[in-house]
């Protein structure tokens, strides 16, 4: 039976963002910060995409569970997401692992990260829970997923991507019937099941789940009492519901948000150096796959009061310039040339230097006569004069973190070891 609606379902929902992961495949980039706190797109943090989706979808109650090296993430949330008004029935809760349920345990898994705050969730009295991963780049209207959940009468609705079948081996994969009811859920299968009518494609979990709140609370209490459980949604909660209840797949193509310039549904896991670099560099294209300029679906974030970017010097061999690049506020390009690069706030690039396919995080200083190609430079790094990266693969690999595709991650610790 379809429920009668007098207001958007999102107004009776809470978004709960799981943001405690390290993101170890990003190597030194997450030595000082959790993966959701990693910078993206010249201005934002990765977590801002899930949070902006929730806000733009109409959800006004949000909780964020943090754990690994959470200081920079918590500071960002406190500064950039402090505009919710309790008198308007809005809330934004930052929920660090604090041993609320057990004096000896931190968050043991994704399900436990929700269970340990079960009293806070129940105090909000919402009808629906939208569980989100805080470490993916995408634009999605969760209201449409909530509508499908209610209309289908599902116990859980799982957001999913259609991916080539043999590329789905690293995901949780859903085997569905012709009505997208999930009949099996397999974590990282060697031979993923195909989609009915399209056997070369598979449905991969996005780590997005919609529940009726009471049902989820019952499932979490049951799971917490099971000594064999690993306290994880993908390994424990979802397989149990698939077997004993009704689980339905929600295809991302049904709720992805696209501007007039976006042709395909865009979702990225920027969990490796190569994927992170590529997703940022893609934004420099004339028509990027992800439109961050879409004013109808803004990506909210903390925005410091900074002066505009500045380009100085106009001599033949010393001209401040940028082509096919994104340059954020408070950057000074002093007689240097940028091509297909993305600079976050506060970057200084000094004379005669050249950057190509470079992702430069905030407050970096690049010395004169430097040539940097295919790099990710961590925040607050000081690049010495005359440094060349991107010409000699063997030398680059000895000095920096060089990826499979030849992208060099540069940190201050690596620079200090050069002795330049």
Swiss-Prot record:
GO terms for biological process: glycogen biosynthetic process. Pathway: Glycan biosynthesis; glycogen biosynthesis. It comes from Sinorhizobium fredii (strain NBRC 101917 / NGR234). This is Glucose-1-phosphate adenylyltransferase. GO terms for molecular function: ATP binding; glucose-1-phosphate adenylyltransferase activity. Its EC number is 2.7.7.27. It catalyses: alpha-D-glucose 1-phosphate + ATP + H(+) = ADP-alpha-D-glucose + diphosphate. Keywords: ATP-binding, Carbohydrate metabolism, Glycogen biosynthesis, Glycogen metabolism, Nucleotide-binding, Nucleotidyltransferase, Transferase. NCBIfam families: glgC, PRK00725.1, PRK00844.1. Pfam families: Hexapep_GlmU, NTP_transferase.
């Amino acid at each position: 039976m379809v429920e009668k609606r007098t207001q958007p379902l999102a107004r009776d929902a809470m978004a709960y963002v799981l943001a405690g992961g390290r993101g170890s495949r990003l190597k030194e980039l997450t030595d000082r910060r959790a993966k959701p706190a990693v910078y993206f797109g010249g201005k934002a943090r990765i977590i801002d995409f899930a949070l902006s989706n929730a806000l733009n979808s109409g959800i006004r109650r949000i909780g964020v569970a943090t754990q690994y090296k959470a200081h920079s993430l918590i500071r960002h949330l406190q500064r950039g997401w402090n505009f919710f008004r309790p008198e308007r029935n809005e809330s934004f809760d930052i929920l660090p692992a604090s041993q609320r349920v057990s004096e000896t345990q931190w968050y043991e898994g994704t399900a436990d990260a929700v269970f340990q705050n079960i009293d806070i969730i129940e105090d909000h009295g919402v009808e629906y829970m939208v569980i989100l991963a805080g470490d993916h780049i995408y634009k999605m209207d969760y209201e449409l997923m909530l509508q499908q959940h209610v209309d289908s009468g599902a116990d859980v609705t799982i957001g999913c991507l259609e991916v080539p079948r043999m590329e789905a081996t690293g995901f949780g994969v859903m085997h569905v019937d012709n009505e997208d009811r999930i009949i099996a859920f397999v974590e990282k299968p060697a031979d993923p099941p195909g989609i009915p009518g399209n056997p070369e494609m598979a449905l991969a979990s996005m780590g997005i789940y919609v529940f009726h709140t009471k049902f989820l609370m019952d499932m979490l209490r049951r799971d917490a009492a099971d000594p064999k459980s690993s306290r994880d949604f993908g390994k424990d909660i979802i397989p149990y519901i698939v077997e004993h209840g009704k689980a339905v797949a929600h295809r991302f193509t049904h709720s992805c948000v696209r501007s007039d310039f976006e042709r395909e549904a865009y979702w990225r896991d920027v969990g490796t150096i190569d994927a992170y670099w590529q997703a940022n560099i893609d934004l420099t294209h004339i028509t990027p796959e992800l439109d961050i300029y879409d004013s109808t679906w803004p990506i909210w974030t903390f925005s410091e009061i900074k002066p505009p970017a500045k380009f100085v010097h106009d001599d033949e061999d010393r001209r401040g310039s940028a082509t096919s690049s994104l340059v954020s506020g408070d950057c000074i390009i002093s007689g240097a040339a940028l091509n297909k690069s993305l600079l976050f706030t506060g970057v200084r690039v000094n004379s005669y230097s050249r950057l190509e396919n470079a992702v430069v995080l905030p407050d970096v200083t690049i010395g004169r006569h430097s040539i940097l190609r295919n790099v990710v430079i961590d925040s607050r790094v000081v690049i010495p004069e005359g440094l060349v990266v991107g010409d000699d693969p063997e030398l680059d690999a000895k000095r920096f973190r060089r990826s499979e595709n030849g992208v060099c991650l540069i940190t201050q610790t690596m620079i200090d070891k050069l002795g330049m």
